[in-house]
Design a protein with these regions (language model features):
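A membrane-interface helix-boundary motif in multi-pass transporters
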Residues: 23-42, 239-270
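Extracytoplasmic gate region of multi-pass secondary transporters
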Residues: 17-18, 81-138, 199, 203, ...
Length: 287
């Protein structure tokens, strides 16, 4: 849960900063974008500088040394079957890719189902789910013998809601249909929560497999999955939306319902692959 609390700031920041940024853009006039970034840079600098001053190790705490002297990162990974680490890296990458694919199209999907006037509110709620997923799933995982179980839960939930929206055509047919609107919003919130929960549980999953003494080096390498997902998730969704379906006008907004639906076909397949990795490639810990 401590890890979840630490990284919940990612989701909470979206909920807090989005309306502030929008307000700044609306009130700063000409050149509002670069003025906004100057203001945010100053605020973030002060907050981060104060934050780093408050960080300190407890006086009597000593870092556990489970890593042998001179042991390289590859030797550390080989303490367990290397396929376990490959599975962890891949399912982390795929979960983030799927999350970013949907989140990057979130506002347009909301407009597509007829809620253009509520985009800001829904974006804030989804950010709360993002932060809540980091806290909730990490706290839930603390009660599990094998932390990989939480990933199985995340992937199953994501598969169920993605499939439900896909097979009902929720995005294409949601405008004016309250049940489909609720289903599409539920998908957005579940994916945001799973995106956050998958991120927050990686350090503890790695520590269970390789020990706290090696966590910094292994976590550093594992975060490359996040970087690669950042390069592929948004671009994948944009490519699908721009090259499939067609843009139409809904309540004065140009959207591509078929394109957004097609994104779900890809994310559903990737979530199924992720679940298979979690089930068959990531070995349970010996604890």
């Amino acid at each position: 849960m401590a890890t979840g609390l630490a990284v919940a700031g990612f989701g909470a920041a979206k909920a807090i900063a989005s309306p502030i940024m929008q307000s700044l853009l609306n009130n700063l006039g000409e050149g509002g974008i670069f003025k906004m970034f100057y203001i945010l840079a100053a605020v973030y600098f002060v907050m981060m500088f104060i934050g780093h001053l408050l960080l300190a190790k407890p006086a009597d705490w000593h870092e556990p040394q489970t890593k042998a002297a001179g042991e390289g990162i590859l030797a550390t990974l080989k303490r367990e079957p290397l396929t376990s680490y490959i599975g962890i890296w891949l399912m982390f990458y795929l979960n983030i890719t799927c999350g970013l694919a949907l989140i990057s199209q979130e506002k347009m999907i909301v407009k597509c189902i007829g809620l253009a006037s509520s985009v800001g509110i829904i974006s804030t709620i989804s950010a709360v789910f993002n932060a809540g997923g980091r806290l909730g799933f990490s706290a839930w995982a603390d009660k599990m013998k094998d932390r990989n179980t939480i990933y199985k839960m995340i992937f199953i939930l994501s598969i169920v809601f993605t499939a439900a929206v896909m097979f009902t055509g929720g995005i294409k047919n949601g405008d004016g249909n309250i049940l489909l609107i609720i289903l599409v919003l539920a998908l957005i919130f579940v994916v945001n929560a799973g995106y956050g929960g998958g991120f927050s549980n990686v350090p503890t999953l790695l520590s269970d497999h390789y020990g706290m003494g090696s966590i910094s080096a292994i976590h550093r390498i594992t975060l490359s999955a996040w970087a690669f997902a950042g390069l592929t998730g948004n671009q994948m969704a944009s490519a699908i939306v721009n090259h499939t379906g067609s843009f139409i006008e809904v309540h004065g907004v140009k959207v591509n319902p078929v394109g957004y639906q097609n994104v779900l076909y890809v994310t559903l397949a990737l979530y199924i692959v992720s679940l298979c990795l979690s089930l068959f490639l990531v070995r349970p810990t010996k604890k």
